[in-house]
């Protein structure tokens, strides 16, 4: 995928949700909640945003936790990705 976000934006791809609950119930596609964990696939350069210097703290390949209603979902080359601001990333998942 060839995409270059601008400013303090980040492109993420959601990590697939579990299809089976802990009790063994298989969930149909519509019943699964969208995951809030994703992998970073592109990072903008940072720079000045609203007159303030923004340093990008994320890198491609990071697994992140993000705000549920953040960003814009788009389809690029047949893949669904979300473009959001770095501020909408809540945490980096380590380990």
Swiss-Prot record:
Record-linked PROSITE patterns: CHAPERONINS_CPN10
Gene Ontology CC terms: cytoplasm
Organism of derivation: Clostridium botulinum (strain Hall / ATCC 3502 / NCTC 13319 / Type A)
The keyword NADP appears for this protein: no
Protein origin, superkingdom: Bacteria
Complex formation: Heptamer of 7 subunits arranged in a ring. Interacts with the chaperonin GroEL.
Encoding gene, per UniProt annotation: groES
Main location: cytoplasm
Gene Ontology annotations of biological process type: chaperone cofactor-dependent protein refolding
Family of this protein: Belongs to the GroES chaperonin family.
Function per UniProt: Together with the chaperonin GroEL, plays an essential role in assisting protein folding. The GroEL-GroES system forms a nano-cage that allows encapsulation of the non-native substrate proteins and provides a physical environment optimized to promote and accelerate protein folding. GroES binds to the apical surface of the GroEL ring, thereby capping the opening of the GroEL channel.
GO molecular function, a single term: unfolded protein binding
UniProt keyword annotation of Electron transport present: no
Protein name (database record): Co-chaperonin GroES
Localization (cell): Cytoplasm
Keyword terms of this UniProt record: Chaperone, Cytoplasm
Pfam family, one: Cpn10
């Amino acid at each position: 995928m060839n995409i270059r976000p601008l400013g303090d934006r980040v492109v993420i791809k959601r990590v697939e949700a579990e299809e089976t609950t802990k009790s063994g119930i298989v969930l149909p596609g519509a019943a699964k909640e969208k995951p809030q964990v994703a992998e970073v696939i592109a990072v903008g350069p940072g720079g000045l945003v609203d007159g303030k210097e923004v340093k990008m703290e994320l890198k491609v390949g990071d697994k992140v936790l993000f705000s549920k209603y953040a960003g814009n979902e788009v389809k690029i080359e047949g893949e669904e990705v979300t473009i959001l601001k770095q501020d909408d990333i809540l945490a980096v998942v380590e380990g």
